[in-house]
């Protein structure tokens, strides 16, 4: 018999508290209209990849440690002579998180990584795209506890995109606030 997996803390919070609160706040007709987080995309652009082809592999390894699943190396779609970039060259790395891994990552990100960011004053509440998705950037990937600071040869920045089923930014903002995203006032 298979062992029962523990339900991630944020998933439990969403199912037990957040769904009810959003249903009351926005007066949805159907429970399927309640916004939920569908995926989290982590992206690292490696600008120095044109000079050293090993850098994207190192960045992908670090991103894999942060995300808990293997990262994919992204390649250039077209050539840009000014940047010495050729089509098909590795220029970054990304990983898409869904389901339990997504909730576990968000939990670690909000409770552990964000408080470790230097001069952190809160997330920008205007970084929504108009369709209920939220994007943010981090200047240093070493804020995550999975990264061993002594073994890091270069500090990378990264983008974190939270995709939701919310129709408007206000619904998405209410959803992320319920997950304790620390937005600036």
UniProtKB/Swiss-Prot annotation:
Transmembrane stretches, start-end: none
The keyword tRNA processing belongs to this UniProt entry's keyword annotation: no
Disulfide bond positions: none
Record family assignment: Belongs to the universal ribosomal protein uL5 family.
Organism the protein comes from: Brucella anthropi (strain ATCC 49188 / DSM 6882 / CCUG 24695 / JCM 21032 / LMG 3331 / NBRC 15819 / NCTC 12168 / Alc 37)
Name of this protein: Large ribosomal subunit protein uL5
Any GO CC annotation of this UniProt entry: ribosome
Domain of life: Bacteria
Subunit-structure text: Part of the 50S ribosomal subunit; part of the 5S rRNA/L5/L18/L25 subcomplex. Contacts the 5S rRNA and the P site tRNA. Forms a bridge to the 30S subunit in the 70S ribosome.
Listed GO MF terms: rRNA binding; structural constituent of ribosome; tRNA binding
Keywords per UniProt: Ribonucleoprotein, Ribosomal protein, RNA-binding, rRNA-binding, tRNA-binding
InterPro entries noted in UniProt: Ribosomal_uL5, Ribosomal_uL5_bac-type, Ribosomal_uL5_C, Ribosomal_uL5_CS, Ribosomal_uL5_dom_sf, Ribosomal_uL5_N
Range of residues in the leader sequence: none
Protein task: This is one of the proteins that bind and probably mediate the attachment of the 5S RNA into the large ribosomal subunit, where it forms part of the central protuberance. In the 70S ribosome it contacts protein S13 of the 30S subunit (bridge B1b), connecting the 2 subunits; this bridge is implicated in subunit movement. Contacts the P site tRNA; the 5S rRNA and some of its associated proteins might help stabilize positioning of ribosome-bound tRNAs.
Protein's GO biological process: translation
Any matching Pfam family: Ribosomal_L5_C
């Amino acid at each position: 018999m298979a062992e029962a997996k523990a339900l991630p803390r944020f998933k439990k919070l969403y199912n037990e508290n957040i769904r009810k609160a959003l249903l009351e706040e926005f007066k949805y007709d159907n429970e399927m209209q309640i916004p939920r987080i569908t995926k989290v995309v982590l992206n690292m652009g490696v600008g120095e990849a044109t000079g050293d082809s090993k850098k994207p592999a190192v960045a992908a390894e670090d991103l894999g440690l942060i995300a808990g699943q293997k990262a994919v190396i992204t390649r250039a779609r077209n050539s840009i002579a000014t940047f010495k970039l050729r089509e098909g060259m590795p220029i970054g790395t990304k990983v898409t998180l869904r389901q339990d891994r997504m909730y576990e990552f968000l939990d670690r990100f909000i409770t552990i990584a964000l408080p470790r960011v230097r001069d952190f004053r809160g997330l920008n509440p205007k970084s929504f795209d108009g369709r209920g998705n939220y994007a943010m950037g981090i200047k240093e990937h070493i804020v995550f506890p999975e990264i061993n600071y002594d073994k890091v040869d270069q500090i990378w920045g990264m983008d974190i995109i939270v995709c939701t089923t919310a129709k408007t930014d206000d619904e998405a903002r209410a959803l992320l606030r319920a997950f304790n995203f620390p937005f600036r006032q």
